[in-house]
């Protein structure tokens, strides 16, 4: 945000309760060997496996587990409200089935229980600018192209079981995404 936002809101007596930090980094700047090594160590030490999907049907079978883990991993946040079954079904139909299954990653323990998940999506910003707000006659092609062939991605959602937090599980997830992209 622009710096004057803070002054404007503080003038009216408002204060910041939470701060949001966004980080952008280039994949070419990432040391992939580090993530591969850490991923291997964390998998061995904690008896974990990554789950990669090739079809939306496979993802849909396990989305209820994912949303249960989402509720569990975000429960301690002050402003979090649990997702109920009706909302789970809505999100499955509205969002999950439109995400490329390669962009959804799970980590499971030796009992095949999901202990972590992450969802990334391609950035549609450039495609939306290119189509100039017009979906038809050919604007939708820009969206389809961006969905399949995109160099920019956004990490939309990540959740880790509280019992597995601070064990390096994110190294498994990020290594899996690095290999996918």
Label for each model-derived stretch:
Residues 164-176:
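Conserved acetyl-CoA pyrophosphate-binding loop and the N-cap/start of the following alpha-helix
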Residues 52-160, 175:
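A conserved beta-strand-loop-helix scaffold within acyl/acetyltransferase catalytic domains
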Residues 33, 128-130, 165:
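Short acidic, gly/pro-rich beta-turn/loop elements at beta-sheet edges
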Residues 1-52:
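Acyl-donor-binding surface of acyltransferase catalytic domains
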